[in-house]
Amino acid sequence: MDYVRAVSGALLITLACTTQVAAQSVIPGPGTTTAIQGELQSAAQTPPQQTTAALVEFICPPGNLLSSDLQTRCNEIAIGVLRGTDTGGALAGLQGMAPEENSVIQTIEVDGAGSRDEEVRKRLERRRKKNQDTEAITMSLNGRPLTPEEALGAERGGGASADYPYGGRWGVFLNGNFGFGDKDNSARETGFRTNSYGVTGGADYLLTDQSIVGLALGYTRQDTDLNADSGFLETDSVSVTAYASYFPSARSYVNAMLSYGHNDHDQKRTIAYTIASPFTQTGTAVINQNALSDTTSRDIGGSLEGGYDFVRGNWTLTPYGRLNVADSSIDGYTEHMSDPTGPGSGLALQIEDQSFTSITTAFGGRVTTVYTGERFDLFPQVGAEYVHEFDNDNEDTRGRLVDDTSGSIFLLPTDSPDRNYGNVTAGLTADFRNGWSGHVLYQGLVGYKDLNLNMFEIGARLQF
């Protein structure tokens, strides 16, 4: 569950190469003097406004190869500030032009990968603990403590699967999940509300009494509404995860996972503002456009975790440490306007490819107890972990206005990632004597600035 980015101090403007001109200029960000004397940047109140203000100052002077609509929108903003006729409308226009909503995809990428990995980790934990439950279930029968052999025999049952404390070498599982969360607005990025639902299924095999390998497939749908009705993002994700576990002893383990996810994104960015305009009969221009686009992204990640179980009676404390590495890439995309001939039709953007890497460590612990019954055993569990982000450095969003044929590039700053945060979990597992088991799980993100995420999961498993 993660993450966001940071601010850059420069705006790069690249002039398109022609037979006469091949040049590249670097224009520092806020404070730069341009043909409009930096007035728009001085009036700008947020980093996205400052970025688009610098761009408008650079491309607005006539003759810079703009479409008619884009030239008109630039002129309205410049006049609104320079003449003081509508500074508020001009600032709304600058904010509307900036694609700060683009950062939502980055947040969705890491959130989805983190939830997916947690499902598989819980699967490995229960599969492994089948071997240890007999130790925790050294309960009494009619007041007499059971011997380890008696407890093991009760846990194994009869049939071919009784040769293995897991209930059999093969295991299959199916999980369903539902998640929700929100992110507050910041100076650089638009906040959002999100919900998701998905399903993950897989199978694993007990290679030896000390090792398991498995494969899981997953699908997730996530719907995200941006604050202030400024747009939405719909994401469909499919994933495959290979996993393995090795336990040198009955109480220690090492887990490894490698996953790949493919994500399809459909998004709408709403551009809506009103500004005084000398170019309309009414003296006012009403911009109400939806910039539509779709793109794909991919994430590949791996994790390595080790832990040890300290058992006392029916209670087990499991401290652990984990290393996570994830690399994500988002394809560039080009927007098209909902009203191609209406005011604001020239404000479509083209966003370049993006990529980022996350490297985190997690240190935490889980506490589990057991309540035994005649037909099944219950295993309540709570856990918490501290996560530190080492990488995921800010990458500004690079893009250009589609109707600016000069090819001028803007760099839009984004939020810094939160380097330190936590996850909490609570769950209940029921293991039945016939090899079936079921569980419910809650996972929550805590201590992450401006971001709240929650996930609930229900699942069933069978060993045979």
What spans do the regions from the language model cover?
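Short glycine/proline- and aromatic-enriched beta-strand/turn motifs that initiate or cap beta-hairpins
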Residues: 25-77, 88-89, 171-187
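Outer membrane beta-barrel translocator domains of Type V secretion systems
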Residues: 80-312, 439-463
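Bacterial N-terminal signal peptides that target proteins for export
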Residues: 1-8
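Outer-membrane beta-barrel porins/channels
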Residues: 281, 286, 298-311, 316-318, ...
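Sec/Tat signal peptide C-region and signal peptidase I cleavage site
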Residues: 5, 17-23
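Outer membrane beta-barrel transmembrane domains
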Residues: 336, 347-464
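Solvent-exposed, glycine/polar-rich loop segments of beta-barrel outer-membrane systems
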Residues: 186-195, 224-231, 264-296, 329-357, ...
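Low-complexity repeat regions of mature extracellularly deployed or surface/particle-associated proteins
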Residues: 25, 156-158, 207, 272-273, ...
